[in-house]
């Protein structure tokens, strides 16, 4: 099960009826000059959901790969994100991203980080609601929003976020936050779904990989998928891209899902949204 030529990727229906492929491809830290080639490889492997951000500085490469692919636009799901330093000018920032991507519309637009010290994410959200109303975005959401950020945003929002993209992997699951989002009707999307590779060496994961003839990454991604979580693993290697996509064919038992869940250790791999500023992003 290490590779797959044709894998049916499940979808998640967002709270506005839009369907998002549950297993996507992320381009965080992919160099701009390599992005087109890498995204072309991902599209050829079978990915139809691509996740980028203005802060990654590789939207143009994503757009070039889309244009070169010949894949009908309606078959693709493209996510990008609002830069932290542009929360006060979200409308123009979105137009810049859309043009860099070479697209008439974007499927999902996220506030990348709350940056509460700026006090601007509610203003940004109101601007995004207008873009959504004008049909330039099919769904709007947030990223890295903790419970208190949601508590600030939701009373001022006319539109409920469709997605909250947060760090989740076996050793850092944010179970309470994920449950809160799901209870509100906000889909949960995991970045760093493999714990930046650190979770793949766990004995439980390696044992299940041997049992299923799968890669450790496929086991961890299957664990995410079993819980309805959207995932966006990244790789710069075409073979690994195909392997990761094959996770959709791995079905774990409830007991095996629980075994992986027991790996929780509170080991955050990325920045803490409560204090992260990243104003330069």
What does each model-found stretch correspond to?
Residues 49, 105-108, 139, 163:
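Residues at the N-termini of beta-strands
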Residues 5-12, 60, 64-67, 93-98, ...:
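Alpha-helical scaffolding within the catalytic cores
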Residues 30-43, 86-101, 148-151, 172-173:
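Short, acidic/polar
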Residues 30-33, 53-61, 83-90, 116-119, ...:
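Acidic-and-aromatic substrate-binding clefts and catalytic sites of carbohydrate-active enzymes
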Residues 81-83, 87-126:
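Glycine/small-residue-rich loop that forms an oxyanion/phosphate-binding "nest" at active or ligand-binding sites
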Residues 14-15, 41-43, 63-73, 95-104, ...:
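Acidic (Asp/Glu)-rich catalytic clusters
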Residues 114-281:
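Beta/alpha (TIM)-barrel catalytic core signal, keyed to glycine-rich beta->alpha loops juxtaposed to Asp/Glu
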Residues 1-76, 127, 195, 265, ...:
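N-terminal binding-site loop/beta-alpha segment at the start of enzyme catalytic domains
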